UniProtKB/Swiss-Prot annotation:
HAMAP family: Arabinose_Isome. This is L-arabinose isomerase. Gene3D superfamilies: 3.40.50.10940. It comes from Bacteroides thetaiotaomicron (strain ATCC 29148 / DSM 2079 / JCM 5827 / CCUG 10774 / NCTC 10582 / VPI-5482 / E50). It is an enzyme of class 5 (isomerase). InterPro entries: Ara_Isoase_C, AraA_central, AraA_N, AraA_N_sf, Fuc/Ara_isomerase_C, Fucose_isomerase_N/cen_sf, Lara_isomerase. Keywords: Arabinose catabolism, Carbohydrate metabolism, Isomerase, Manganese, Metal-binding. Belongs to the arabinose isomerase family. The keyword NADP does not apply.
Length: 509
């Protein structure tokens, strides 16, 4: 798989001024080059850093920020003030900057050279001074950004920059993201609906409707030989009963049908340039022509693993969010998935929620090799034996997130969770995870419900709330974080204060 981050870069712009003379200008440039080389050579950053020079005037700032806006490879800008850099010279550039901004408050030298420091050294190395000036103008202008404080070689500093870079990549990816809705949302469901125009304006992605009949035109054109080849891939990649390979059985035919559905979905998604899709079990094509005999669950599982966003029952917000999660998660070890809250297990301190769906859970979170099975699925317009991958998730900590439309804004809801080992489910042959929402089921689920959270969410073992805080900052949307320290009383107050803030903030902007 190609590294999704290789197509991107982050620009590094140093702030200074000409007051301190030519030697200072040369030193600032040399230090900046060394720092950028060090950042790239650290092996800790997923995106290449490109030094774009030192800005000593308003025109230079404006020029580099305009260039950043117009370069598709640039997904964000890091600024650092080596010397004092009068902030009025940053105003016009900041007014025009459209890319995510990280303000790095660091210093070329780690420690003060107590015995040798003179006025020349202090004038040259005054990030403590310059970064406060820059920070003031950003705050005065209401510029959303991430501020990272720490020595540029230290692990924690590099980690915070890396988190922001991953979010920037996910954000850049969403700016030309197309989500295809095969059929509409599930009838009468509120939380999966929302304002698609506002979503595109705020988060970048575009949502289109595609009738199932159009998908079926691709389905008709799939060649049997290609289906046979994909079925062979299934049998090679997944555990399964040997009897499943018997071509005379209904079970084999259902696997074959699932492979044909996957090829049809791949073909239409590629043709349309889509990065994600939704399905609806009540819209699977007409019975008088080519049609799916049940929802394309196995196809959805496999496409999610490759990075396609997915949302069940027409949930386009989850489809877009999952694609972003997948991009941010690339190169991290434990995986991510679309999930749905299904069933509660009240068990004292271990009270938990079974996460599953009818079929569509991503195998990236599987604890062991997924097993290909065929079982009856009795929901939707067609009730049929249906192929799917069956597995349980890894155990360990993770973070799940969802976006809901509050009418006057989007709210990102994030919950830290602990995935635990489930008991066997011999009568429920689906993929699943079992987790305890932090701080416990009573508070975690209660806070999620108070926030208006969905029954669908996008989960990752590797992403933390820090990623989502950066995402919400870039998008300019509300975020609430349910964690080990959450109490219902304080959470209610936060929601009420946020309500007032976003009303007033929208009026002021």
């Amino acid at each position: 798989m190609n590294n999704v981050f290789d197509q991107y870069e982050v620009w590094f712009v140093t702030g200074a001024q000409l007051l301190y003379g030519g030697d200072a200008v040369i030193a600032v440039d040399a230090h900046s080059n060394e720092m950028v080389n060090g950042l790239n050579e650290s092996g800790k950053l997923p995106v290449k850093v490109v030094y774009k020079g030192t800005a000593n005037s308003s025109k230079e700032v404006e020029a580099v920020f305009k260039a950043a806006n117009n370069d598709d490879k640039c997904v964000g800008v890091i600024t650092w003030m080596h010397t004092f850099s009068p902030a009025k010279m940053w105003i016009h550039g900041l007014q025009q900057l459209k890319k995510p901004l990280l303000h790095l408050h660091t210093q070329f030298n780690k420690e003060i050279p107590w015995d040798t420091m003179d006025m020349d050294f202090m004038n040259l190395n005054q990030s403590a001074h310059g970064d406060r000036e820059f920070g003031h103008i950003c705050t005065r202008m209401r510029i959303r950004r991430k501020v990272v404080v720490g020595y540029w070689k230290e692990e924690e500093t590099l980690h915070k920059i890396a988190v922001w870079m991953r979010v920037c990549a996910g954000w850049a990816d969403s700016q030309d993201m197309l989500i295809i809705r095969f059929g509409d949302q599930m009838n009468n469901v509120a939380v999966t609906d929302g304002d698609k125009v506002e979503a595109e304006q705020r988060m970048g992605y575009h949502v289109d409707y595609c009738p199932a009949s159009e998908l079926m035109e691709y389905h008709k054109d799939i060649k049997n030989a290609d289906v046979d080849a994909l079925v062979a891939t299934y049998f090679n990649d997944y555990d399964h009963d040997a009897s499943l390979e018997d071509k005379s059985t209904e079970a084999y035919q259902k696997v074959w049908n699932a492979a044909k559905a996957e090829l049809a979905l791949r073909a239409i998604l590629k043709a349309k340039g889509a990065k994600g899709f939704t399905t609806n079990f009540d819209d699977l094509g007409q019975t008088d022509g080519s049609y799916f005999d049940q929802i394309p669950g196995l196809a959805s599982q496999r496409l999610m693993a490759e990075g396609y966003g997915f949302g069940a029952e027409g949930d386009w917000k989850s489809a877009a969010l999952y694609r972003t999660v997948w991009v941010m998660n690339q190169g991290l070890p434990k995986g991510c998935s679309f999930l749905e809250d299904y069933t509660l297990n009240f068990d004292g301190a271990n009270s938990s929620i079974l996460q599953s769906h009818m079929l569509e859970i991503c195998p990236l979170i599987a604890a062991n090799k997924p097993r290909l099975e065929v079982h009856f699925l009795g929901i939707g317009i067609r009730k049929s034996q249906t192929a799917r991958l069956v597995f349980t998730s890894k155990t360990g900590t993770g973070c799940t997130a969802t976006v809901v439309d509050m009418g006057n804004r989007f709210r990102l809801i994030v919950n830290d969770v602990e995935c635990i080992e489930p008991k066997p489910l011999p009568k429920l042959p689906v993929a699943s995870a079992l987790w305890i929402p932090m701080p416990n089921l009573e508070v975690g689920a209660g806070a999620w419900i108070l926030a208006g959270g969905t029954h669908h969410s996008c989960f990752s073992y590797d992403l933390t709330a820090e990623y989502w805080e950066d995402y919400a900052e870039i998008a300019g949307i509300e975020m609430v974080h349910i964690n080990k320290d959450t109490t219902i009383s304080c959470f209610k107050k936060e929601l009420r204060m946020n309500e007032v803030y976003y009303m007033l903030n929208k009026a002021l902007c």
